[in-house]
């Protein structure tokens, strides 16, 4: 269910982005490039601790709440350090990634990936406690909210700006569509934190170094596998713009490439479904 919901959201968002962002603007290329780095950082900041939490929470002789507290403290601490470093060296990082004119893109997505990384642990806790309704409700509300905000900024605001400019002119910039995509993501990630307030209180936040060390050692292979998997999916979108002397042309071509690759993914899904059906048929 979760995969189908996320897949539906991605399909709707990609269709919206390719329709609203002109190919010549390179906007979809920017979105694809930034989200590729975001996916990589999400794997790094969780460093396999979600799997480690499940392993040790279900292990006899371990206190599940102590395991949960150590998972929250470790992932939360790493995420906070990551955000602070990104904000401290924001302009150099933006220059390195060729977003010197829009360092706020880096700042917003750094906060998004930090929030999403931290929230992986409460989501895992809901699964551990066998609370699928709240898990699915948060996911569903986040998806609906994300789509709604994208529709608001990318479709409704441009229409209002033309027909009733006074209603949106005080905050809306028609040339900042890519920025509104990242703003929408940040809003949803921040609001989602409030749903986890009950899961973030009622127990002692005490770091157990011995337990944490064992959890990190167990989770490290998961981190390596996660990095290999995510790089296989995203490294092309990370390096694509750097293959062109003209940065803008690189983003334009990346947008086209990323959009067409989504079609290939859908074709691969249908092919795989056909093979599974064929091999399981009597």
Where are these regions (language model features)?
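Alpha-helical transmembrane segments of multi-pass membrane proteins
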Residues: 40-41, 76, 80, 84, ...
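Short membrane-interface helical motifs at transmembrane helix boundaries
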Residues: 15-18, 81-100, 157-169
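Membrane-water interface segments that mark the loop-to-transmembrane alpha-helix transition
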Residues: 8, 33-34, 43-91, 104-107
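Helix-loop junctions and terminal segments of transmembrane helices
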Residues: 45-61, 260, 264-282
């Amino acid at each position: 269910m979760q995969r189908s919901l996320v897949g539906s959201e991605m399909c709707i968002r990609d269709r919206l982005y390719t329709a609203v962002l002109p190919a010549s603007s390179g906007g979809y290329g920017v979105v694809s490039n930034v989200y590729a780095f975001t996916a990589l950082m999400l794997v790094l900041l969780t460093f396999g601790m979600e799997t480690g939490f499940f392993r040790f929470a279900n292990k006899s002789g371990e206190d599940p709440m102590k395991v949960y507290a150590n998972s929250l403290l470790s992932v939360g601490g790493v995420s906070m350090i990551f955000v602070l470093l990104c904000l401290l060296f924001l302009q150099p990082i933006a220059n390195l990634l060729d977003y010197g004119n829009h360092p706020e893109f880096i700042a917003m997505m750094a906060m998004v990936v930090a929030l999403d990384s931290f929230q992986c642990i409460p989501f895992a806790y809901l699964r551990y406690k066998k609370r699928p309704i709240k898990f699915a409700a948060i996911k569903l509300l986040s998806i609906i909210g994300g789509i709604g905000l994208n529709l608001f900024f990318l479709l409704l605001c441009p229409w209002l700006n033309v027909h009733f400019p006074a209603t949106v002119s005080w905050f809306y910039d028609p040339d900042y569509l890519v920025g509104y995509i990242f703003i929408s993501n940040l809003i949803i990630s921040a609001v989602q934190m409030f749903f986890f307030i009950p899961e973030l209180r009622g127990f002692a936040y005490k770091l157990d170094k011995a337990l944490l060390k064992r959890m990190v050692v167990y989770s490290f292979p998961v981190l390596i596998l996660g990095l290999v998997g995510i790089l296989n999916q995203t490294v092309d979108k990370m390096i694509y713009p750097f293959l062109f002397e003209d940065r803008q042309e690189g983003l334009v071509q990346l947008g086209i490439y990323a959009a067409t690759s989504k079609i290939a993914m859908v074709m691969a899904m249908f092919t795989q479904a056909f093979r599974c059906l064929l091999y399981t048929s009597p």
